């Protein structure tokens, strides 16, 4: 058959759309979606035919031109375009707060509250008892004050946003004093100095990368009176223009650590210095640990204890050790939080009803530390004991062997980690199932698992594929095993 004959054999779009399968599909997905898919399939066939050489045209599969064949291809095309880019995966890496996998899984009550709140209208900015307009800032502020001991609180969309609005409200046009050892990059090339520049505040670095004393902060303080006599050409070899000091700031080293010959000013020392000079103290905590977890090897500062040192403002993430949704949470003295709520950035950085729904349900768990430990997945994973993990590893190994008799499983000891820019030096002793799938290499097996209906994201160490059970929920064991079929 010649190329022109093949082109004449292309079916008409309307004829293909009359196929019963596409009529039903159009009712579900819409006429436009299905018509566009048919048009795309026919256009592809036309292009394929035009690319043929005359002498090879007779080799073209004419069955592809049938209406039912085009309809089938259109169905595949619609299904492919309907596939979501954001979907569930199983975390078998042993990294609890895996940034690439969405950080903290939500607790069941948070999930239910999001579903309930998002199904219809909500009390986002309406005071139901009083029958008048309300403020979203009030939704979780009382709960945060109760849990942290703060005078007031507000929520923005992430901790970088919290840093931005805190510095803009408290430090614009003034200097913020920070230790050189705490000028962190928080991920994605976003750095504290860059955020400070955007806020309009001026960075004053003190100390060195490994040692910063409280006297370094005090020596850097610039008052209005001092500015009157300040001459950058005489006082500073760099001839740097100076501004009045607006605040002292401490940034928790949550995604790295400095060991060896080190020294840093404590929150207590900074709070005392701030009171002495009438300067507020800001603590960018980052990780959001609400309760003491030292019993489980996590010796990180917690929020209530940090605020109790006398600092003025504290900010942290919602989706790290707090175990909630992505959010930037700011707690502290009422005068500073009130200024942030009125700041123009507050509207640009505000969060939606689903974030508040998840956050409120998560925070409620912290009214009883035992309940938080039981119900919040992040805390539960951190606190999992070795006996529980060993037993889960044995069940997973048995399930994988049952799914595929060619797979060789071995239970091995591993070191899990917190991840997500939290507690970088902490290693949690755990267990994993080391898997050898027939003659496949670890890399090939890892790719196979990623192609499963629910992709399994595993860990490779020393050319061994490891399924770390700390981050695999009990109800996910069957799905992991099915990925080996």
Task: Locate each region found by the language model.
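Structural motif of enzymes handling amino- and sulfur-group chemistry
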Residues: 335, 343-344, 351-402, 412-415, ...
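Flexible, glycine/charged-enriched surface loops at secondary-structure junctions
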Residues: 28, 53-60, 85-88, 230-235, ...
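Long amphipathic alpha-helical segments
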Residues: 1-78
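Short Gly/Ser/Thr- and Asp/Glu-enriched loop/turn motifs at secondary-structure junctions
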Residues: 10-11, 90-94, 322-325, 428, ...
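Conserved C-terminal alpha-helix-loop-beta "cap" of PLP-dependent enzymes
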Residues: 386, 390-473
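Conserved PLP-enzyme active-site core in the AAT-like
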Residues: 83, 131-366, 401, 483
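Glycine-rich phosphate-binding segment of PLP-dependent enzymes
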Residues: 43, 92-93, 103-129
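Long amphipathic N-terminal alpha/beta scaffold segment
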Residues: 56-106, 112-113
């Amino acid at each position: 058959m010649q190329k022109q004959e093949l082109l004449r054999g292309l079916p008409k779009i309307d004829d293909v759309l009359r196929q019963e399968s596409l009529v039903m599909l159009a009712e579900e997905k819409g006429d436009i979606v299905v018509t566009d898919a048919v048009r795309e399939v026919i256009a592809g066939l036309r292009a394929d035919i035009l690319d043929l050489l005359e002498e090879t045209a007779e080799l073209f599969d004419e069955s592809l031109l049938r209406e039912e064949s085009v309809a089938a291809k259109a169905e595949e095309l619609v299904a492919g375009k309907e596939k979501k880019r954001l979907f569930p995966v199983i975390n078998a890496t042993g990294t609890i707060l895996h940034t690439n996998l969405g950080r903290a899984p939500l607790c069941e009550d948070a999930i239910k509250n999001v579903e309930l709140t998002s199904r219809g209208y909500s009390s986002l900015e309406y005071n139901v008892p009083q029958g008048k307009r309300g403020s979203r800032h009030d939704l979780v502020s009382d709960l945060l004050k109760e849990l942290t001991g703060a005078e007031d609180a507000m929520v923005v969309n992430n901790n970088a946003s919290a840093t931005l609005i805190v510095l803009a409200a408290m430090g614009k046009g003034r200097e913020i004093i920070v230790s050189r050892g705490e000028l962190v990059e928080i991920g994605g090339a976003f750095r504290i100095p860059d955020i400070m520049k955007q806020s309009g505040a001026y960075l004053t670095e003190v100390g060195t990368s490994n040692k910063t004393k409280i006297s370094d902060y005090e020596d850097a303080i610039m008052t209005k009176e001092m500015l009157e006599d300040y001459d950058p050409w005489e006082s500073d070899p760099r001839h740097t223009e100076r501004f009045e000091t607006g605040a002292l700031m401490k940034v928790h080293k949550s995604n790295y650590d400095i060991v060896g010959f080190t020294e840093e000013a404590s929150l207590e020392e900074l709070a005392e210095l701030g009171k002495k000079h009438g300067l507020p103290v800001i603590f960018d905590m980052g990780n959001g640990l609400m309760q003491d977890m030292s019993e489980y090897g996590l010796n990180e500062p917690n929020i209530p204890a940090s605020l109790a040192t006398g600092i003025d403002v504290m900010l942290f993430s919602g989706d790290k050790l707090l175990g909630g949704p992505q959010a930037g949470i700011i707690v502290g003295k009422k005068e500073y939080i009130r200024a942030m709520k009125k700041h123009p950035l507050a509207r640009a950085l505000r969060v939606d009803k689903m974030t508040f729904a998840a956050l409120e349900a998560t925070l409620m768990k912290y009214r009883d530390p035992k309940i938080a430990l039981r119900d919040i997945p992040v805390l539960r994973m951190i606190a999992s004991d070795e006996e529980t993990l060993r037993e889960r590893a044995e069940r997973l190994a048995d399930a994988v062997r049952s799914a595929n008799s060619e797979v060789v499983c071995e239970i091995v000891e591993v070191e899990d980690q917190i991840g997500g820019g939290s507690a970088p030096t902490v290693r949690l002793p755990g267990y994993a199932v080391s898997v050898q799938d027939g003659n496949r290499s670890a890399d090939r097996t890892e790719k196979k698992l990623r192609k499963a209906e629910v992709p399994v994201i595993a860990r490779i160490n020393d050319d061994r594929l490891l399924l770390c059970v700390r981050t695999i929920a009990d109800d996910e064991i069957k799905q992991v095993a099915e990925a080996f079929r």
